[in-house]
Amino acid sequence: MANNEEHPPRGNEWEVVSLTSSAYAAAPGPYNVESRDVRKYDAYYGAETSRDLYMSEHFVFPPSEHENLPIDESLFVAEQRKDGRDLMLEGQGLSDQFHYEAGNNQQSIYGESALGSSRHMESFGSESAVYEHGLVDAEGNLDLHSDGEGEKDVKKSTHNLPCEAWWKRRAISMYSRTREANAIWSLFFAAAVTGLVVLGQRWQQERWQVLQLKWQSSISSEKLGRVLEPLSRLKDVIVRSNPQASLVRSGSSSEV
């Protein structure tokens, strides 16, 4: 009530105040600091006054101020509840662009909320992926560190072993190496034996071939001897039957 008494309503001030182009073009006065209640009051009733002035068509608003006029939310809600809200808006001198801009504002609000939720989900997913990646890296580093420590522990244990255990370890390693060497030597020995067997078989084959040649040559010489033996006998018989001819031949041969 105190606020209403101190500041009377300004809804009908335009009826008594004559606005001219020179007064409208004049520069605004100095900025006065007002209280919070006064600002709310001025914003509400100033919006109503400006709307009434605009409806009265006393003057034309500049484009910049026409676009930034405050909107009376109570009037807008009341008119939306009516069936002919578009007609009412047109009757008051407001264009359809007002309704279109309001719808766009609502859509932008929902779009921003959806975008914010999607961004929130994306950021949450990226943070979870980064967290999981960090866990995997940490586990890998722990595994590598544990492997390095295990190798160091094995080396220390080998250096700190007592003499008997060290000798047993060396004996086992030598036995494993000898087994590997024995396997290699066994393969080498088997290859050598197979080579000797092959060479022996070839030598036997060649020996049999030589024996066959000798036997064939002996057989041929025996056959030749058998053929020549009767001829030699025939010659002896002829010589014995003609002793003079043999003497003449012997004499002629001596003279020569």
Curated annotation (Swiss-Prot):
The keyword Membrane applies. It is found in: Endoplasmic reticulum membrane; Membrane; Plastid, Chloroplast membrane. Keywords: Autophagy, Chloroplast, Endoplasmic reticulum, Membrane, Plastid, Protein transport, Stress response, Transmembrane, Transmembrane helix, Transport. GO terms for cellular component: chloroplast membrane; chloroplast stroma; cytosol; endoplasmic reticulum; endoplasmic reticulum membrane; intracellular membrane-bounded organelle. It is a single-pass membrane protein. The chain crosses the membrane at residues 181-200. It comes from the Eukaryota. A motif (AIM (Atg8-family-interacting motif)) lies at residues 14-17, 208-211. Its main location: endoplasmic reticulum. GO terms for biological process: plastid to vacuole vesicle-mediated transport; protein targeting to vacuole involved in autophagy. Induction: By salt stress. Involved in a special stress-induced plastid-to-vacuole protein trafficking pathway. Interacts with ATG8F in plastid bodies to subsequently enable their delivery to the vacuole by an autophagic pathway. Interacts with the plastid proteins APE1 and PSBS/NPQ4 and may recruit them as cargo into plastid bodies that may be recognized by the autophagy machinery for degradation in the vacuole. Involved in the alleviation of damage caused by salt stress during plant development, probably through its involvement in plastid-to-vacuole and ER-to-vacuole trafficking. Plants over-expressing ATI1 display increased ability of seed germination in presence of exogenous abscisic acid (ABA). Plants silencing ATI1 and ATI2 display decreased ability of seed germination in presence of exogenous ABA. Interacts with ATG8F. Interacts with ATG8H. Interacts with APE1 and PSBS/NPQ4. This is ATG8-interacting protein 1. It comes from Arabidopsis thaliana.
